[in-house]
């Protein structure tokens, strides 16, 4: 998958150093994936929540952090990082429109 907005992850882990290793792992796993549809995401990330408009919420570091990505499945294989934040920050946003 081709991932856009990696800088969002870097900015976040600079503020929350304990998030760096889990976010790097997420990035590496997604970068090497080839998701044809939501089922492929579910196989890799069983706790992911699926929203409208191909948005997916990923739990990072045991649900301490949340990451929202919008996915263009194959043949494009694109992932747009829309949000990364603490659980409290996530609770204050509309995950389906961010």
Question: In which residue ranges do the predicted regions lie?
Answer:
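Basic, Lys/Arg-enriched alpha-helical interface segments
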Residues: 1-64, 72-77, 87-98
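Catalytic Cys-His active-site segments of thiol-dependent hydrolases/isopeptidases
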Residues: 81-84
